Amino acid sequence: PESAMLFFSVAMLYFFSEWIDREGWWRFVLMTLCATLAFLTKLPTICLGLPLLYLCLQKYKLYFLTQWKLWFFATISILLTFLWYNHSNYIKTIDGSISNNTLSFRYYVFEYSIYLALKLSFYKKVFFSEVFEKDLIYAGGVLFIIGIIFTLKKKEFRYIHYWLLAILIYFFLAAKEVVWHTYYTIPIIVPASVFIGYAISNSLKLLTAYKVTGIKKIILQAFFIVMVVLLPLISYHKITGRYKAKRLEKDYPVQIAGKIVDETARENDLVIGCIWGGPELLYYCNRRGWTMDSNICSVERIESLRREGADYFVTTKLDVIDSSVIDYLKKNYET
């Protein structure tokens, strides 16, 4: 969903800025549609309201509060999002399971965000390991910082600055997910690309503007060239590294288990895939069914799904699942 989220987010920001400048109902409809779809794809994208607010203040000052079209836009996009997430939370509780309310500010901020924000490991994991190392692959990270420094006083970049700030706020509000799932930092790549592109395309102009001459100019020019050359080289290394056999070893048991089920089970059999809660086992089994977290796997939950039609229980986490659950399955079912 991250690709869809980025697409709708960028489209929302673009059409909103176009509507602010030239208005028009077709722009209004497109910006409202894209905003709603962005919020529905990933709830924290609501933080992108910050650059939208900046544009409103730029054009209307405080009189934006009297613009009924802005209120209509906010009401439609946020109300539809609220109704959907409220419904999805209700769906989770139908079978009696406990659901963490995805609309709960208290759940996100007071139970996780504040705690994580006070830990140095959070900043190292998110901003260095994920953003600087994986998302921007070192060279891009350096150019990103340079781009920010050189655009701090440029008003035409203020919109992008607020966009970046909104994403940083989102990192803290959704700190639990950002730390756990590496792909949650992907949204920063879009505004970062603007700053990186500015730093690269204006390197010579920037050197002239700041009156850098002599050996310093040569060193800085060489630095920019090295950064640009390193980007594709590091990218190639990162991508090919993910396909090395040693890195893929952890997925082999899941693939093997899935293949066995695919060859054994009937086409319409339903499967319980028990690893860490992800869908990989169902994917390799080529069957529909349910996912289950091996850390909280229980006899009660398994039996509940069996009554709903589950035919197979598949796992590669025998060392993680409670031994009493394994003993129960071996005693009562064919293994």
Language-model-detected regions and their locations in the chain:
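Hydrophobic/aromatic-rich transmembrane helices and adjacent perimembrane loops
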Residues: 2-5, 38, 47, 161-170, ...
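Short periplasmic/luminal acceptor-recognition loop of GT-C membrane glycosyltransferases, typified by
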Residues: 251, 255, 261-298, 311-318
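Transmembrane-lumen/periplasm boundary regions of multi-pass, lipid-linked membrane glycan transferases
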Residues: 37, 48-155, 168-179, 230-237
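Transmembrane alpha-helical segments
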Residues: 8-20, 31-34, 46, 50-57, 144-148, 199-204, 217-249, ...
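Membrane-interface transmembrane helices that cradle and orient dolichyl/undecaprenyl
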Residues: 12-28, 38, 62, 151-152
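Periplasmic/luminal catalytic loop of GT-C fold multi-pass membrane glycosyltransferases
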Residues: 140, 298-335
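Membrane-interface alpha helices of multi-pass inner-membrane proteins
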Residues: 15, 27-43, 49, 168-170
